Amino acid sequence: MKQQAKSRKPQQPEYIFQVETLSHEGRGIAHYGSHPDHPADKHGKKVFIRYALPGETVKAQITHEAKRLEEAEMVELLAEPSANRVEAVCPHYGICGGCSMQHIHPDEQIHLKQNVLQSHLQHFAGIQPEQWLEPIRSLQSDYRRRARIGVRYLPKQDRLILGFREHHSNRLTSIHTCSVLDKKLSDNLPELRNLLQSLKGKAHIGHVELAKGDHEISLLVRHIEKLNNADVNQLRQFALHKGWQLYLQPKGPESLRRIDEEQGAMRLHYALNAFDVNFAFSPLDFTQVNATVNEQMVQLACELLQLQQGERVLDLFCGLGNFSLPLARCVGAKGQVVGVEASEEMVQRATDNAKRNNLVQASFFSQDLTKDFSHHSWANQGFDALLIDPPRAGAYEIMQYVPNFGAKRIVYVSCNPATLARDAGVLVQHGYQLKKAAVMDMFTHTEHVESIALFEKIQEIND
């Protein structure tokens, strides 16, 4: 096995297990009692084994004990590996906590994620879609176009660590490459680490953020004390040499500033070519990390909504307009798209993006969607279609207002299958039917489940 476990802890017991199935987050599940060495008082107790796959016989070390279950980590594969086991592509896998499924075949990863979504829909809402759509897959392994990377200076060793947190730990593990990070970013990690190591103020740097647009790359340095002029100049020369945008952030988001602002505005850009729209964004703005999955997702959302020229669409949690602008293209100049987002800064960004694309039919409003918004004029105009793309907490507070919107079709984009299923149950009570659903492999090699679902109004219900 390729570095898929940390060093053993001698004080923790090791046992042999027969792995039966996978948990939702990709750990092997076994039970005590399947081997003669198991303690008799533990027979029947469930064990979650990191890196183990169904059908395998493994030796695992117990890492955590609770009343009803235990957690363990595989230390040795004792027989034939599962057909779904593959070699991890990253040399840091097993120590770095970023990925959790690199040892699982990509097809099986997607199958597992679909099972998770099916299970949650059944458990929380008692429903299944009429049709499961083909999963949206990532087209490349180095899919991440942005990353926050921790920085820690060890003065006794005069060594700077640039890397990600270890699994279930706040400790940073040093990395020299990242297999899921865009190659243009990953290839520069060693040189970036050496640069930070050379700075006088390296102990004051908390993290760096790398972001990639279609044609630009930004480096953001988060520092807790002011950097001297020599350090800033070193960072500037590095960025100039690479052709990158350089940003410094000494405090909160409002303190972000671009070095050498005369070279251009504080913006990166990406396009959704299928809709002929282009977006400008700041290094701190939320954007989808996987460009190819994002474009497929937006295309599918528009197809599911079956928009016609002149229709009205409401886009809740619209961000910088990732869905709103393509939707505006679909409804044409005689239609209307209303985007709503809590952040005033993101509303301004969406408004600016609509202007740069000449989409006058798109308008945006700032509103905390967890609070009552029924008194706002935009909420009482009626819509043909509704798109919801909430954070992990879901959109439960919004569900009570859905009947008032009058939408015939709803597309719900989710990053949490549990809250999607919960909200789906409410939509069914409001007379909607779950017609189609698909999982999206936005975060390949991780347990994160992204999904998209179509609901259609099938009957009138007096709420």
Curated annotation (Swiss-Prot):
KW Ribosomal protein (keyword) present: no
UniProt-listed Pfam families: TRAM, tRNA_U5-meth_tr
Superkingdom field: Bacteria
Enzyme Commission identifier(s): 2.1.1.190
Keywords tagged on the record: 4Fe-4S, Iron, Iron-sulfur, Metal-binding, Methyltransferase, rRNA processing, S-adenosyl-L-methionine, Transferase
Purpose of the protein: Catalyzes the formation of 5-methyl-uridine at position 1939 (m5U1939) in 23S rRNA.
NCBIfam families assigned to the protein according to its UniProt record, in alphabetical order: PRK13168.1, rumA
PANTHER family assigned: 23S RRNA (URACIL(1939)-C(5))-METHYLTRANSFERASE RLMD (PTHR11061:SF49), RNA M5U METHYLTRANSFERASE (PTHR11061)
Full protein name: 23S rRNA (uracil(1939)-C(5))-methyltransferase RlmD
Record lineage: Bacteria, Pseudomonadati, Pseudomonadota, Gammaproteobacteria, Moraxellales
